[in-house]
Amino acid sequence: MTTIRVKDNEPFDVALRRFKRTIEKLGLLTDLRAREFYEKPTAERKRKKAAAVKRNYKRIRAMQLPKKLY
């Protein structure tokens, strides 16, 4: 469980922002959303493969030279 100690004279907004940043770094929200509903193993493999293809395509596009701008 993640805990945040609120410092003396620290506004609530700042403490809440620190808490949100910590949760985001740990990846808890994405993990909870992924586990919210059961996903069949075949659907999980299909989703991961599609993400890998997308990443690969994006990497290849980044390595290509830009088209002439004229």
From Swiss-Prot:
Classification via PROSITE patterns: RIBOSOMAL_S21
Entry keyword annotation includes Ribonucleoprotein: yes
GO molecular function: structural constituent of ribosome
Gene3D superfamilies in UniProt: Ribosomal protein S8 (1.20.5.1150)
Assigned GO CC terms: ribonucleoprotein complex; ribosome
Record-level GO BP terms: translation
Keyword Ribosomal protein among UniProt keywords: yes
UniProt xrefs under InterPro entries: Ribosomal_bS21, Ribosomal_bS21_CS, Ribosomal_bS21_sf
Swiss-Prot/TrEMBL keywords: Ribonucleoprotein, Ribosomal protein
Family under the similarity heading: Belongs to the bacterial ribosomal protein bS21 family.
Stored NCBIfam families: S21p
Name of the protein: Small ribosomal subunit protein bS21
Organism: Polaromonas naphthalenivorans (strain CJ2)
Source species taxonomy: Bacteria, Pseudomonadati, Pseudomonadota, Betaproteobacteria, Burkholderiales
Name of the encoding gene: rpsU
